[in-house]
């Protein structure tokens, strides 16, 4: 499918470029294919970002011989020389086409950017207004990522009224009526619709038992992935707006010194970064699993208190410096008295330390999942990671770590590494074992038994019937085509593959692992749907919402929508002194689900503190 923000002119230019490449490929006898696998829908591709900026872009992909010569199954050969030649031909053919008509290509580029302004200026959703009251760090970070791409973002002051609402904490505003308006629309709109005729064809293919033709995700709205509250409207008040620069520091919220100590509200990824930086600097903090109120301010579950009595005299200046560098909120505490909730000597508070984290790496793990996870931990949260090769996991001294993470796998990592006994002992001794996506099924296998869940098969109308033995079977009459289809349906089939949608996950707010959340947006891909944990085995800390409220963005097959409802997103199961945490979908996919970074911190930072109680 094509992204609807690609213009007809751009598609015509792509065809023009392709036709000249085809002419040259024909001259050299080079076979090629187009349009069969890849799409032009998701904006994260190397050709889609320039396209949505007004360029004419496309991807050339050449099969690799994995060396100098590759023998195909049909007996023909693919050589390295051919690959080089084909890339040169396609590149020079592109240059030739544009050189013949360069003035009109430049004219088209200018027209694309002018029309983006005109189109947005007339739209009812011209302005995107992002609330700074919640997920402030994610909203501020998103604004800077947009500005770094040349998109203008403005800040409006606290108390201003926009889109008929008052923004007590202020807001960030993006006007789509700018040259990159189509890129803005693609990145920030809640959803980008698939062409109706394409959807109809995919549903028809599924009915015929064929695979769908979606290459990648159908959802990517950046505010939704970042957990940022936003709305769109036709008019806003920008009379007091201030433009944001890409290198502007995120404003910190720091005020005064505290005689008793300092509190860090556990509300977003920036707050987690501040706590982690403070722990890394050697300061001692305690986290609460129950909200408390001091001087009228509610500090949610997960919030951290750094008491002056537990720390050196540099506590105040250093925390202030870290909060300023990160752009976090730090509140001074004059005394330990609270109006509501637990006092700081309560068992609700757990002492924290800088977690020592190991990550399964290399053979058997998904390279992208392992890399995404390491990036989120090290670059987004500031937690060093020790990668452990799968081949040595069974021999590694896991007592050196507080947390072990198994990212998404291709299956068999635990068996391949012969690490089941090691992992069980690690958890029993107080460790936090975290698994993502397919790794959950490895820990749930009978051989490992660390998660009391199972993968589900697809829901089915098929009647398995009685076992039939011998060379013949009783006769059947099929009265309708539906009877026939039901009879041949594979009752052992897995759920339909989901290319990628954003769905709503509801939090069990009584559990420490849900600190900072009432709900979250999760990216769901693949076929894996798990059974919920029984209450006697553990907790379903996040479950997917009911079928009517499940889908946040993207296109989801109806069968999956019904089956995914109420199923677990995050599970926690205690064994001995430790805990096993299963994310049925990866929270670090592409390292762009910034709204889940706080949840990752819950598992990696709060988890060891809770297990040490």
Regions found by a protein language model. Give the residues of each.
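Intrinsic-disorder/low-complexity accessory segments
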Residues: 2-32, 36-42, 46-613
């Amino acid at each position: 499918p094509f992204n609807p923000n690609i213009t007809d002119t751009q598609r015509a230019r792509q065809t023009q470029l392709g036709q000249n490449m085809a002419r040259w490929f024909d001259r050299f006898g080079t076979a090629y294919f187009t349009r069969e696998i890849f799409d032009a829908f998701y904006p994260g591709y190397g050709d889609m970002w320039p396209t949505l900026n007004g360029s004419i872009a496309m991807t050339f992909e050449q099969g690799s011989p994995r060396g100098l010569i590759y023998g195909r199954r049909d007996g023909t050969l693919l050589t390295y020389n051919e690959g080089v030649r084909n890339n040169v031909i396609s590149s020079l053919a592109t240059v030739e086409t544009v050189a013949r008509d360069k003035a009109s290509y430049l004219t088209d580029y200018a027209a694309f950017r002018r029309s983006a302004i005109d189109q947005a200026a007339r739209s009812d959703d011209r302005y995107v207004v992002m609330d700074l009251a919640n997920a402030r760090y994610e909203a501020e970070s998103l604004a800077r990522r947009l500005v770094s791409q040349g998109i203008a973002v403005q800040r409006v002051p606290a108390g201003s009224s926009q889109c008929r609402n008052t923004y007590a904490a202020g807001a960030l505003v993006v006007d789509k009526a700018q040259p990159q308006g189509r890129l803005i629309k693609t990145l920030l709109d809640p959803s980008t619709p698939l062409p109706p005729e394409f959807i109809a064809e995919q549903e028809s293919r599924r009915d015929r038992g064929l695979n769908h033709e979606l290459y990648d995700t159908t959802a990517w709205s950046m505010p939704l992935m970042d957990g940022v509250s936003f709305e769109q409207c036709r008019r806003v008040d920008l009379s007091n707006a201030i433009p944001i620069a890409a290198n502007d520091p995120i404003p910190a919220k720091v005020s005064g010194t505290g005689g008793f100590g300092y509190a860090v509200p556990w509300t977003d990824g920036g707050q987690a970064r501040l706590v982690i930086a403070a722990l890394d600097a050697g300061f001692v903090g305690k986290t609460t699993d129950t909200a408390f109120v001091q001087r009228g301010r509610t500090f949610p579950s997960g919030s951290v208190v750094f008491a002056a009595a537990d720390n050196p005299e540099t506590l105040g200046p250093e925390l202030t410096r870290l909060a300023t560098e990160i752009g976090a909120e730090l509140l001074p505490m004059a005394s330990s008295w609270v109006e509501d909730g637990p006092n700081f000597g309560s068992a609700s508070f757990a002492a924290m330390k800088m977690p020592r984290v190991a990550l399964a790496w290399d053979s058997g793990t998904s390279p992208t999942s392992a890399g995404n996870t390491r990036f989120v931990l090290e670059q987004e949260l500031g937690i060093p990671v020790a990668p452990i090769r799968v081949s040595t996991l069974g021999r590694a001294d896991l007592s050196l770590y507080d947390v072990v993470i198994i990212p998404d796998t291709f299956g068999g990592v635990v068996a391949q590494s012969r690490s089941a006994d090691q992992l069980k002992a690690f958890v029993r001794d107080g460790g936090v074992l975290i698994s993502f996506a397919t790794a959950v099924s490895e820990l749930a296998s009978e051989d490992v038994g660390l998660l009391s869940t199972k993968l589900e098969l697809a829901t089915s109308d098929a009647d398995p019937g009685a076992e039939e033995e011998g060379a013949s079977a009783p006769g059947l009459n099929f009265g309708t085509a539906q009877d026939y289809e039901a009879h041949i349906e594979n009752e052992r089939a897995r759920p339909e593959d989901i290319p990628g949608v954003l769905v709503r996950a509801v939090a069990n707010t009584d559990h420490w692992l849900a600190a900072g959340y009432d709900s979250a947006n999760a990216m769901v891909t693949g076929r894996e749907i798990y059974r919920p944990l029984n209450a006697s085995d553990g907790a379903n800390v996040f479950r997917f919402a009911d079928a009517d409220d499940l889908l946040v963005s993207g296109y989801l097959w109806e069968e999956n929508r019904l089956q995914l409802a109420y199923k677990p997103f995050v599970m926690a199961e205690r064994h001995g002194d430790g805990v096993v945490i299963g994310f049925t979908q990866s929270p670090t996919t592409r390292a762009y689900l910034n709204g889940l970074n706080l949840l990752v911190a819950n598992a990696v930072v709060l988890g060891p503190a809770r297990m040490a109680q």
